[in-house]
Regions:
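Solvent-exposed loop/turn segments at secondary-structure junctions
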Residues: 37-42, 80-84, 153-156, 173-177, ...
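Membrane- and interface-active hydrophobic/amphipathic segments that mediate membrane binding, fusion
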Residues: 227-248
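His/acidic metal-ligating clusters that form di-metal
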Residues: 31-33, 45-157
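Extended active-site neighborhood of metal-dependent phosphoesterases/phosphodiesterases
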Residues: 1-69
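A generic structural motif
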Residues: 5-10, 75-76, 203-205
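Acidic/histidine-rich helix-loop elements
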Residues: 3, 8, 43-45, 97, ...
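Binuclear metal-dependent phosphoesterase catalytic core
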Residues: 14-26, 32, 121, 126-127, ...
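Metal-dependent catalytic neighborhoods of phosphoester/phosphodiester hydrolases
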Residues: 1-3, 88, 159-164
């Protein structure tokens, strides 16, 4: 489109990048990647394809070369999170306060508060555990991703830093015709200083704080994934002893 400022990306129209220039209008301050995480596969999600990963690696190298050999600090946004986000959780027992059940590996988790802060209301529907997209590893190797933010899981809005130093988190839910309204409809704001973009600040703005009323959609919230937690806790309370026997 005539007024689109994004640079055409890989083989799909939804994977691209946008350069953000400094106040002089000439020097690149930072970069934004948008990655299409595609569709479902085998009951889970595929994550990005090899062609998209190849494009990202090439684009990262191109920007680095044009920046005097220094990686261009970048924020990355995509719908489905990478599976490495599970590294911010601690496995726990089902009756632990705040425990969340994961359908991916049938384990219970709580947020590791030494690594992340915010709401953790459902286990991430990340790319499949048995799929190796190589995306997260590429972020680490290229050294340009200063933050990766996701959507999809409406009951999550936490942000944390991985063991590799990459900030990962959720943007919060904005829609009013989807589950998770009881957790608050939000937008995530990013504040960056062109003199030091890596030291950026991000926070959520809540609909109820602006409008003085809570967003609620009882129908969709009834079928929220958080209901799974309640069902599984009842199941474990009744049959947990049998489950533990099978695990042994």
């Amino acid at each position: 489109y005539p007024n689109c400022i994004a640079v055409k990306g890989s083989t799909d129209p939804f994977t691209n990048n946008t350069l953000v220039y400094g106040s002089d209008g000439k020097s690149v301050a930072f970069n934004i990647y948008m990655m299409d995480t595609n569709n479902t596969a085998n009951g889970g999600y595929t994550g990005i394809y090899k062609e998209q990963l190849d494009w990202y690696n090439a684009k990262s190298a191109e920007l680095k070369a044009a920046n005097g050999g220094k990686a261009v600090p970048s924020l990355l946004f995509q719908h489905v999170p990478v599976k490495e986000i599970y590294g911010m959780f601690t496995e726990c027992k089902w009756n632990t306060d705040g425990a969340v059940y994961s359908r991916r590996d049938h384990k219970w988790y709580v947020l590791n508060e030494e690594m992340a802060k915010g709401d953790f209301g459902e286990a991430p529907c990340s790319e499949n555990f048995d799929v190796h997209t190589g995306e997260y590893q590429a972020w680490v190797e290229n050294g340009d991703i200063m933050g990766a933010f996701f959507a999809h899981d409406h009951n999550n809005n936490f942000v944390g830093k991985s063991a590799d130093g990459i900030v990962m988190g959720y943007n919060g839910g904005t829609g009013f015709r989807a589950y998770g309204a009881k957790c608050g409809r939000t937008i995530r704001v990013f504040n960056l200083d062109e003199n030091d973009v890596t030291n950026y600040e991000t926070h959520l703005i809540y609909y109820n704080e602006l409008m003085g009323e809570k967003a609620s959609n009882p129908f969709f919230d009834t079928f929220s994934p958080s209901i799974l937690n309640k069902i599984m806790k009842v199941f474990y309370a009744m049959f947990g002893w049998a489950i533990n026997l099978f695990k042994k």
